Amino acid sequence: MEHYISLLVKSIFIENMALSFFLGMCTFLAVSKKVKTSFGLGVAVVVVLTIAVPVNNLVYNLVLKENALVEGVDLSFLNFITFIGVIAALVQILEMVLDRFFPPLYNALGIFLPLITVNCAIFGGVSFMVQRDYNFAESIVYGFGSGVGWMLAIVALAGIREKMKYSDVPPGLRGLGITFITVGLMALGFMSFSGVQL
């Protein structure tokens, strides 16, 4: 149990997808103008990562890994295309389930669900899971923790950007300029976790 808690803390803070690996930056910067929309996208990313990482773990270990299907057959060259296909399928299934059973939540998320398909933080989580050879339980914890870490980062950035509306920002830095500086300072803050050994 202690191993899973340390993996969760590690994936949220020490190896934060957005602020340590800088994955998912397109949506991270584009959607972080308001806390409400950032939170909605963050929840969707948590759900997709929590499902996509373990499902791709099963696909990799049961189909793609060397000697998984047949002795002497290695399908690991199909990793990228298979993982992207599984992520896209999961996002479509999630979109249909939300549309059918939770219409208010589906309408609130709107365009954010299809955007998750191309969010490289999702693919990064799956790739790290394979690279680090996590088992199924570890992949669930890692997927959830990575999603929570990404959501924490985007909600924090959105809160800072909302407060910066009332600040006197120099004209040359308004918009993305000050946002990049803010993200850099946030990443420096998260670097302090890199010394923590779990």
From Swiss-Prot:
It is a multi-pass membrane protein. Belongs to the NqrDE/RnfAE family. NQR complex catalyzes the reduction of ubiquinone-1 to ubiquinol by two successive reactions, coupled with the transport of Na(+) ions from the cytoplasm to the periplasm. NqrA to NqrE are probably involved in the second step, the conversion of ubisemiquinone to ubiquinol. The keyword Transport applies. GO terms for molecular function: oxidoreductase activity, acting on NAD(P)H, quinone or similar compound as acceptor. Composed of six subunits; NqrA, NqrB, NqrC, NqrD, NqrE and NqrF. It is an enzyme of class 7 (translocase). It is found in: Cell inner membrane. The keyword Membrane applies. It holds the Pfam family Rnf-Nqr. HAMAP family: NqrE. PANTHER family: INTEGRAL MEMBRANE PROTEIN OF SOXR-REDUCING COMPLEX, NA(+)-TRANSLOCATING NADH-QUINONE REDUCTASE SUBUNIT E. Keywords: Cell inner membrane, Cell membrane, Ion transport, Membrane, NAD, Sodium, Sodium transport, Translocase, Transmembrane, Transmembrane helix, Transport, Ubiquinone. It comes from the Bacteria. The chain crosses the membrane at residues 11-31, 39-59, 77-97, 110-130, 140-160, 176-196. Its EC number is 7.2.1.1. It catalyses: a ubiquinone + n Na(+)(in) + NADH + H(+) = a ubiquinol + n Na(+)(out) + NAD(+). GO terms for cellular component: Gram-negative-bacterium-type cell wall; plasma membrane. It comes from Vibrio campbellii (strain ATCC BAA-1116). This is Na(+)-translocating NADH-quinone reductase subunit E. GO terms for biological process: respiratory electron transport chain; sodium ion transport.
